[in-house]
């Protein structure tokens, strides 16, 4: 089971100067107490303003009020990571055979710069309501090529290339959707 300690471990990893996470800047934007000193290596990891008084409670201290803080916790940098798995497998902890998933799907295959495949997670709390068996995400670097494949029925969804939304929303009013990122 996921515990509050898994969040603390993840947030400390993100701010760790030893690991030099490419998303350390995100922790700084979140205004977590002490984050800049931790990232700079001027303070120990346990001085970061995040703690877990028990398995079900995460306490975050901010250095300044941040009205959008809750929304910032939807970024993957803030997701829990299992310390025991990382310690056992090191850099291979994110491989399909080792990665721990908390959601409706688990990673079953990953080919960098090509695709990732996820299958239903039997351990998911609401697995009975999960109706899609497998999700395949393809890496398509050209939005126009992706749109062509979508229109040919090869993809279920894609990003809309810049400037094409007005035309697509007229031609495909039930399919072309716009929402904030």
Language model feature labels by segment:
Residues 2, 69-73, 167:
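Periplasmic-binding protein-like
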Residues 1-26, 53, 59, 146-152:
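Aromatic- and charge-enriched surface segment that lines or borders ligand/interaction sites
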Residues 12-20, 65-67, 74, 78, ...:
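Sec-exported extracytoplasmic/periplasmic mature domains
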Residues 108-119, 123, 136-181:
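Extracellular/periplasmic solute-recognition and catalytic clefts
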Residues 32-47, 53-57, 61-134, 142-144:
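Gly/Pro-rich hinge or "lid" segments in bacterial periplasmic/extracellular proteins
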Residues 1, 63, 181:
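Periplasmic solute-binding protein
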Residues 4, 23, 66, 162-165:
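Alpha-helix initiation and N-capping motif
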């Amino acid at each position: 089971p996921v515990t509050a300690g898994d969040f603390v471990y993840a947030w400390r990893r993100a701010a760790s100067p030893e690991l030099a996470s490419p998303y350390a800047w995100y922790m700084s934007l979140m205004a977590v107490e002490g984050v800049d000193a931790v990232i700079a290596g001027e303070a120990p990891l346990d001085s970061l303003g995040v703690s877990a008084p028990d398995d079900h409670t995460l306490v975050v201290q901010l250095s300044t009020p941040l009205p959008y803080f809750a929304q910032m916790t939807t970024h993957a940098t803030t997701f829990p990571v299992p310390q025991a798995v990382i310690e056992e497998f090191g850099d291979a902890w994110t491989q399909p055979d080792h990665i721990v998933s908390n959601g409706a799907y688990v990673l079953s295959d990953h080919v960098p710069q090509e695709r990732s495949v996820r299958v239903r997670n039997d351990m998911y709390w609401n697995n009975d309501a999960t109706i899609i068996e497998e999700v395949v995400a393809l890496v398509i670097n050209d939005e126009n090529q992706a749109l062509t494949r979508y229109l040919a029925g090869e993809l279920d969804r894609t990003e809309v290339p810049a400037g094409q939304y007005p035309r697509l929303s007229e031609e495909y009013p039930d399919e072309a959707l716009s929402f904030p990122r």
